[in-house]
Amino acid sequence: MVQEYDVIVIGAGHAGVEAGLASARRGAKTLMLTINLDNIAFMPCNPSVGGPAKGIVVREIDALGGQMAKTIDKTHIQMRMLNTGKGPAVRALRAQADKVLYQQEMKRVIEDEENLHIMQGMVDELIIEDNEVKGVRTNIGTEYLSKAVIITTGTFLRGEIILGNMKYSSGPNHQLPSITLSDNLRELGFDIVRFKTGTPPRVNSKTIDYSKTEIQPGDDVGRAFSFETTEYILDQLPCWLTYTNAETHKVIDDNLHLSAMYSGMIKGTGPRYCPSIEDKFVRFNDKPRHQLFLEPEGRNTNEVYVQGLSTSLPEHVQRQMLETIPGLEKADMMRAGYAIEYDAIVPTQLWPTLETKMIKNLYTAGQINGTSGYEEAAGQGLMAGINAAGKVLNTGEKILSRSDAYIGVLIDDLVTKGTNEPYRLLTSRAEYRLLLRHDNADLRLTDMGYELGMISEERYARFNEKRQQIDAEIKRLSDIRIKPNEHTQAIIEQHGGSRLKDGILAIDLLRRPEMTYDIILEILEEEHQLNADVEEQVEIQTKYEGYINKSLQQVEKVKRMEEKKIPEDLDYSKIDSLATEAREKLSEVKPLNIAQASRISGVNPADISILLIYLEQGKLQRVSY
């Protein structure tokens, strides 16, 4: 008997688990198929979650009802807030994961999720009827039927590991690759590209001389990604910093001809922002040294990840490199680094919901869409799961805008601009980064998560209480006038401020650069009554109010452009006035509104003006079929 589901998820990596959980949590009967049940949420590369921009994505996933934040909060070995000396727009949390515990915890969550079924199996083929997906067929001929399918195959599609002059079919960490499914996507007409990524050697902790390295401890205060976490792991393990040197670079230079990167063996495009050590040596040969972070892979293993030493050089050369690095001279290499090539689809073949334009009800998420990173994958998986379930259950899909979330920036970049290399999310990619902060992800997205059925009533009530406390405290400080008495003047001067000439509202005093919420309470002779996250919001929203309001005005302008919809089936070849390049790009991307059209590379303001004229005159309808 053929089994039927609402949604099938192919793959159980970081995109797959979020897709499966989101679909199930929205009420869809969901099946997750994966090559190996023991590798659910596996971390084949760095054992970490978060960092600049990426850490904010993890907070956004949590605010929308996803899982990654909760799981890393329970299984990390270290957590640090980055960029604390800078403004709130670029602060981000980063955690070192216990990669085995992370996998185990995520597998437990998936097994306990109602509506989510998991099965070990390799999908070889999609079942398609009239350009609509109807299910999948495995390598042993088993068929599973569904109303929607989400492909989250990571780097497994026609995966090939490259090490020196060796090249062989493999998924990450020497797992089985998925070859036939990649061929099936080509046969269906998808435009496929070849990308490459890599990983460094792992060494035995017992053989490292840590006295020659610099300790990198975690923060000594409780940190968490999830807004629901209340218990913090304070027993943390340190990381360690060391460097390459002239000796290391000589080993690389002497053996560069053996690197698959430079021998011509690697055809795929590698990630610009995570280059291999040989690539760094060639591109930045004026630098006398490069940072290397020694990151423990967990509490119950001796394996240490040498962050920054990603390489495809032969194993014996990797050993020679390690022997030149302070602290690693006698290190025992437990796993060699390698490069991996894999297939990805050109992401402009997707709608902003992550549904493919070519095949109805077929979605893709994660590295198959050309991204790099666990967090980028998880964010896409979450949205694909939300949208696939919403479509088949008729409960609504959701497109995050660039002003809603970094996840919105990520997806819009992919489907509007595409990518010719593994895409990494950066704070510089977000034009509204002062709005898209680590601290306010819940204020931006919890309402949305609740409307989508991803947030419980209890959690939503707590969130609303927090929001009301923030608003009430800002109003309270706006009504309190501080007198310029000696008590006040002494505290202000003590903190580097200039004396008051007249009375001032507490909220206006807080706007001064040297003032903090703590100092205001000291002046008012009050005790702390609110949670730290509420106080943080009061301070940030007050100090940056002018900048935030400017950003919100820009958002409103874009929203007006987003309201100018473009029919999906518009035939741009009928609009004679458009430039040839614009016509080609618009036909490829099929933007849903004028705002998206304006972000397409090759579409200039004159082309947008022509589209606007057609919209206003109603001519778009006459050239649509």
From Swiss-Prot:
Belongs to the MnmG family. GO terms for cellular component: cytosol. FAD binds at G11, A12, G13, H14, A15, G16, V123, S178, Q367. Homodimer. Heterotetramer of two MnmE and two MnmG subunits. NAD-binding protein involved in the addition of a carboxymethylaminomethyl (cmnm) group at the wobble position (U34) of certain tRNAs, forming tRNA-cmnm(5)s(2)U34. It comes from the Bacteria. PROSITE patterns: GIDA_1, GIDA_2. Keywords: Cytoplasm, FAD, Flavoprotein, NAD, tRNA processing. Its cofactor is FAD. One of its GO terms (biological process) is tRNA wobble uridine modification. It is found in: Cytoplasm. NAD(+) binds at residues 270-284. It comes from Staphylococcus aureus (strain bovine RF122 / ET3-1). HAMAP family: MnmG_GidA. GO terms for molecular function: flavin adenine dinucleotide binding. Its main location: cytoplasm. NCBIfam families: mnmG_gidA. The gene is mnmG. The keyword Lipid biosynthesis does not apply. InterPro entries: FAD/NAD-bd_sf (IPR036188), GIDA_C_N (IPR049312), MnmG (IPR004416), MnmG-rel (IPR002218), MnmG-rel_CS (IPR020595), MnmG_C (IPR026904), MnmG_C_subdom (IPR047001), MnmG_C_subdom_sf (IPR044920). This is tRNA uridine 5-carboxymethylaminomethyl modification enzyme MnmG.
